[in-house]
Amino acid sequence: MKDFAAIDFETANSERSSVCSVGIVIVRNGEIVDSYYFLIKPEPEYYSYWNTQVHGLTMEDTMNARVFPEVWAEIAPKIEGLPLVAHNSPFDESCLKAAFQMYQMDYPDYQFFC
């Protein structure tokens, strides 16, 4: 696979919809061509101790961040047509689907690989 987008979500709490950050690396022809990192205001908006221990993010970090639909509107054109690759793809795919559902957005049929 020479063209793909590597993606990684972090969540604020045990709710998969509570994405608080996303990192994306775009690879074309086997070369990294772009990378992005966005803080996201989570929904529901609270942080659990254990999640913060994993990623170090707190409510203060995302207090003024954009909500998921605004961030995804910027990301979607950058990953259009690319398979999504994640270290723990079941988790990351479930986060993406949950965020789409939380905001009543139509979920495109993204193809995930691990």
Where are the language model's segments positioned?
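Conserved non-catalytic scaffold segment of RNase H-like nuclease domains
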Residues: 1-109
